[in-house]
Amino acid sequence: MSATTPAAAAPKKPFYRVLYIQVLVAIVLGVIVGWLWPEIGKNDWIKALGDGFVKLIKMVIAPVIFCTVVSGIAHVSEVKKVGRVAIKALIYFEIVSTFALALGLIVANVIQPGAGFQGQTNAAAVANYAKQASEMKSVDFVLHIIPDTVVGAFAQGEILQVLLFSILFGIALMSLGERGHTMRAFVDDAAHAIFGVIAIVVKAAPIGAFGAMAFTIGRYGPQALGNLAGLIATFYLTALAFVIIVLGIIARIAGFSIFKFLTYIKDELLIVLGTSSSESALPQMMEKLERLGCSKPVVGLVVPTGYSFNLDGTNIYMTLATLFIAQAMNVHLSFGEQITILLVAMLTSKGASGITGAGFITLAGTLAAVRPELVPGMAIVLGIDKFMSECRALTNLCGNGVACVIVAWWEGELDRDKLRAALDRDIDPSDVEVAVTTG
């Protein structure tokens, strides 16, 4: 991939045309509308604004993954490199995920947000989540990665299935050598067109953020917080500490600042905050990481895989919420049981990836495996899960972004000049052209 070149001659955008400012204003307006006029906020048409934007983004996720992975692998000289990147990514995911799970346990034990909580459990309210959790099996998860048909994988937007086919297709194209030149050029050109579609769709981000936030506040409202505000605050502060301290230290080891990195991805963070979906920023995130200096093969392999195997925010939530429920129900968990929770959560957090309500399903699976009597206690946190999902999504996005840069650095596939240029100067991505090599 050729070097990024800032469009230095382009005039600076007026502040009201900057995406992150538009999204931020939209979020604030959404909160105001949902709070002051909840009946308007709960309107199906308002909800459709947020849902529609997320669907528009999901529409291009599979093509983005396919083109990025195939183009990246097809230009690699050897298959070993692909395997090496995948192994390093999985090692990183497991280490950092363990840190996230452990942090949730430590904070819950120290602060004890559920101690003295007065609330009611409701087994019926969480019966569906418990049922789905009981049906989760590791072998089913592995088999689910293999699509029944290639068309079905793309049609249903199954990230891991699309990723598997893309890797195989990229390796096959790489093995063709010069005979595959025309197809490589086609995929590269298709990538440009797809990212052009994304540039159009992202312009609707403020509308989507407004609709999603207005509905969330209008539907659940501040009254949904009640005496669970302590748990929400604990989770948000714990996630913030994880990003600033844990990811910050990891970033510093690789030679970049976590604060500059967060500034660089501010547009994506605000889109995720507004939509409560980390997938809503996946295509833009992949494009930005390439501009940051990460090689195309690393971005194509690490980011989509991370959306299933590197869910730092979800991991923190699982252990923190588990202990909160136990404390609220006056159930003591021994040190051994807490270690078991950590080990079980490492498995269940992968088993429900891509499933709607995955955070709650994995929580049910973890509780059922360790102390089944705690499953009805999930009803305590059911009402605030929408507010928690925003923090989970934000933390997951930060974790996957840092993971990609770290794996690229570890593999020697990180362009330091691009990294410094993007972070130190905070180049506006819309003022940068990315050229993809076709040969």
UniProtKB/Swiss-Prot annotation:
GO molecular function, one term: fumarate transmembrane transporter activity
Pfam families noted in UniProt: SDF
HAMAP family associated with the record: C4_dicarb_transport
Domain of life, source organism: Bacteria
Keyword presence, Membrane: yes
GO cellular component: plasma membrane
TM annotation in the entry: 18-38, 56-76, 91-111, 157-177, 193-213, 231-251
UniProt-recorded name of the protein: C4-dicarboxylate transport protein 1
GO biological process assignments: L-aspartate transmembrane transport
Family stated for the protein in its record: Belongs to the dicarboxylate/amino acid:cation symporter (DAACS) (TC 2.A.23) family.
Cellular localization per UniProt: Cell inner membrane
InterPro entries: C4_dicarb_transport, Na-dicarboxylate_symporter, Na-dicarboxylate_symporter_CS, Na:dicarbo_symporter_sf
Predominant location category: membrane
